């Protein structure tokens, strides 16, 4: 991987000769507070990322895949090897330079409301979005606020949010695939687009004392049975993002269940697991995993990442930009894991052991 002007490029041959242009933006379902230019506190509409996603789908068409997470929205634009640089420049112009298409935006607003109303009836979707209240409490997320915000969001508020948040300082770019050469002139064009807006943006929140966070249990009626377990990890402020990531990757691997969702940002760290039955998972974190568990996890993670880059570049690219937005370089993480020995890991894990709290959401017909 090579980096020019804060854009990371990775040459990898894929049989379809495609290039995967990936933009990660530090906005998501749970991003409420931002600090603009180190002085202005901006309160974001919680529905902004979902409406932005639908607007981009209407604007960019079939060649784009968009994923909206809790703090990161990822846009993957596929280009052909022969024309990827021109496509890349056009893509950046659409994101950063072109004016908002108001008619498309109105369609995106109405479509977002209709889609949310439809999926909200699904118990698993509702449980997941409800679980963020526990997992992302330090960022001020509430499901009720998201629902209200979606109804309140209008063109003027969206355009204002776009100008403040869709800027290069709040984004990460990663280009992966069958890359042909990029000239100095083309790099200058790209650099000029990215430097067109120079404000700084930082995700906001409040680091509450994890000792004050209680366990919780929520029961709701639903059209289907759902069991969801949420583990929240309260790290000390001095623990680095890299150490948090290593800890979460290794320690959560021993948790039973399916559809695990690990999340890490500056304010919250969590694991959300869908399980067959209601379980108590806190006890798994009373001590670091054993040497044999460590070896299995280490091999499993290396194999998974290698499989992603070979067979699932979209998933791989999403991981890379999300890590970059958390100031973690994928190559550094991989190098750290390769060199990491169990004795060193156990020592680090015992020192940074977080306070683990747990919530369960049970939905029954």
Regions found by a protein language model. Name each.
Residues 1-61, 163-255, 357-365:
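His/Glu-rich zincin catalytic helix
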């Amino acid at each position: 991987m090579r980096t020019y002007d804060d854009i990371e490029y990775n040459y990898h041959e894929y049989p379809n000769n495609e290039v995967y242009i990936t933009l990660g933006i530090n906005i998501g379902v749970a991003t409420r507070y931002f600090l603009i230019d180190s002085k202005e506190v901006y309160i974001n509409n919680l529905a902004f990322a979902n409406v932005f996603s639908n607007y981009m789908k209407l604007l960019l068409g079939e060649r784009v895949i968009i994923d909206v997470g809790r703090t990161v929205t990822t846009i993957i634009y596929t280009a052909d090897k022969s024309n990827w640089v021109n496509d890349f420049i056009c893509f950046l112009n659409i994101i950063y330079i072109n004016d908002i298409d108001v008619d498309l935006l109105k369609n995106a607003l109405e479509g977002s409301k209709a889609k949310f109303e439809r999926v909200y009836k699904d118990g698993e979707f509702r449980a997941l979005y409800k679980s963020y209240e526990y997992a992302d409490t330090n960022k001020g997320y509430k499901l009720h606020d998201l629902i209200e915000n979606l109804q309140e969001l209008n063109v003027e508020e969206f355009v204002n949010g776009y100008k403040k948040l869709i800027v290069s300082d709040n984004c990460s770019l990663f280009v992966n695939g069958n890359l042909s050469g990029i000239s100095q002139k083309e790099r200058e064009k790209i650099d000029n687009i990215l430097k067109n807006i120079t404000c700084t943006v930082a995700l906001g929140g409040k680091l509450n004392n994890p000792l004050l966070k209680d366990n919780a249990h929520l029961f709701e009626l639903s059209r289907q049975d759902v069991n969801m377990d949420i583990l929240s990890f309260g790290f000390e402020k001095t623990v680095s993002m890299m150490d948090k990531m290593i800890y979460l990757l290794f320690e959560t691997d021993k948790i039973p269940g399916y559809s695990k969702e690990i999340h890490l940002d500056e304010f919250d760290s969590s694991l959300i697991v869908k399980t067959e039955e209601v379980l108590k998972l806190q006890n798994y974190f009373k001590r670091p995993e054993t040497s044999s568990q460590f070896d299995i996890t280490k091999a499993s993670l290396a194999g998974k990442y290698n499989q992603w880059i070979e067979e699932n570049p979209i998933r791989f690219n999403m991981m890379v930009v999300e890590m970059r937005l958390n100031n973690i370089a994928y190559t550094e993480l991989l190098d750290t894991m390769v060199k990491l020995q169990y004795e060193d890991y156990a020592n680090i894990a015992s020192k940074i052991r977080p306070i683990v709290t747990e919530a369960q959401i049970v939905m029954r017909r």
